[in-house]
Amino acid sequence: MRALRIALWALALGGIGLACAPAQAQSPHTHMHSFSGAEHWARVFDDPERDAWQKPHQVIETLALGPDAAVADIGSGTGYFSVRLAHFLPKGRVYGVDVEPDMVKYLADRARREGLRNLISVNGAPDDARLPHKVDLVLMVDTNHHIERREAYFRKLAQSLNPGARVAIIDFNAQSETGPPPAERVAPARVVEEMAAAGFRLLGEHHFLPRQYFLTFQLKGAG
C-alpha cells in the first residue's frame, strides 16, 4: 500500500522520482516498489510545486477542526499533511500513520527536529492503523485505493474514533492525468458504497481539488 503510493506521488509530481526509482525493486505479484530512501522521497513529496494542486491549507481549513482535535493522517509518508496539521493544532494531537518503517522513522525524526511534540509517528499495518488513542478525524490522502480489504479496514478503524468523528478521503479522480492506472482508481460512488457497507454515511463532498475528489464520512447514527 504505502510503497505504491510513493510511486504515484512521483508520477503526480511530474516523474521526478520515477527517473531515480530502482526498477529491480518492483514485484510482479504486488506491483509495488521498495522506496527506503525517505530523505530522497521527502524532496519529491514536499516539493513546493505540489501545493498548487494539493491545496493543503484549503484542505485543512475545510476540515473545520477544533483547537484540541486529535487527528490521524493515514498514509502520512514524510509528513506533508501531518506536519501542517501539527502546526495548525498546537493544542491538539496528530498521529502520522505509515506502514513503511523508513517513513515512520523519518517522520519521528522530523517531528523532533521541528519541535512538534504533538506529532506522533505510528507504524501501522496494511490491515490496521494501530492508533494508540481515539481520534476526532481520520485523513487519508491517496491511500484508500491501496487498501485491499477496505470494508474490514474501516470497520476496525471505527473502533478508534471518538463520538462524532469524521473520516476524510482524498484520492485521484478519473480525469487526473497523473496517479495510478485507471483500473486501480476507486470511483467516488464506489467509495460511498464501500463506506456504507462499513457503517459510515457520506457527510459532504468538496470539489476544489483539480486532481482529486474529497469526501467526508461519519459513522451512521453519529452526530
Model regions and ranges:
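A short glycine-rich, Lys/Arg-flanked "PGG" loop and its adjoining helix->strand segment in the class I
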Residues: 151-166
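Conserved alpha-helix/loop element of class I SAM-dependent methyltransferases that forms part
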Residues: 51-69
